[in-house]
Amino acid sequence: MDQTLTQFGSVFVFLLLGVIFVVGGYLTSRLLRPSRPNPQKNSTYECGEEAIGSAWVKFNIRFYVVALIFIIFDVEVVFLYPWATVFKPLGTFALIEVLVFAGILILGLAYAWVKGDLDWVRPTPNIPKMPPMPELPVAKGASQKD
């Protein structure tokens, strides 16, 4: 029981020292920094240029598609690394499992590729124009509305 409290106590002391370090650094920098606000310092700074327009701009959805595909394959590597470190004791069954896992991801990538979601500039469809419809003859005695 005493050893358990000692272990929790050391974790508590470590967390307390971490909080004190962060708060102490923040307070020290706040006390030592000069504070002379003026309109030029309070203006928005963007790479040395005056900000033009709103910061809320619409990004092309393809940026998000590329980012999502990157995250999917990044997570795949996170799952494959532990598997690769203990591959020999797991045997053939583990190899088949990881091949199925990678195959599902590759099928998803192939589907996105074939669908055209990975193309940065999508081609515009070439739809032929239909010739105008000929006017139908009007029966005798029927009135035409113009």
Curated annotation (Swiss-Prot):
Keywords: Cell inner membrane, Cell membrane, Membrane, NAD, Quinone, Translocase, Transmembrane, Transmembrane helix, Transport. One of its GO terms (molecular function) is quinone binding. It is found in: Cell inner membrane. It catalyses: a quinone + NADH + 5 H(+)(in) = a quinol + NAD(+) + 4 H(+)(out). Its main location: membrane. Its EC number is 7.1.1.-. InterPro entries: NAD(P)H_OxRDtase_bac/plastid, NADH_UbQ/plastoQ_OxRdtase_su3, NDAH_ubi_oxred_su3_sf. It is a multi-pass membrane protein. Disulfide bonds: none annotated. It holds the Pfam family Oxidored_q4. The chain crosses the membrane at residues 8-28, 63-83, 93-113. One of its GO terms (cellular component) is plasma membrane. NDH-1 is composed of 14 different subunits. Subunits NuoA, H, J, K, L, M, N constitute the membrane sector of the complex. NDH-1 shuttles electrons from NADH, via FMN and iron-sulfur (Fe-S) centers, to quinones in the respiratory chain. The immediate electron acceptor for the enzyme in this species is believed to be a menaquinone. Couples the redox reaction to proton translocation (for every two electrons transferred, four hydrogen ions are translocated across the cytoplasmic membrane), and thus conserves the redox energy in a proton gradient. Belongs to the complex I subunit 3 family. This is NADH-quinone oxidoreductase subunit A. It comes from Chlorobium chlorochromatii (strain CaD3).
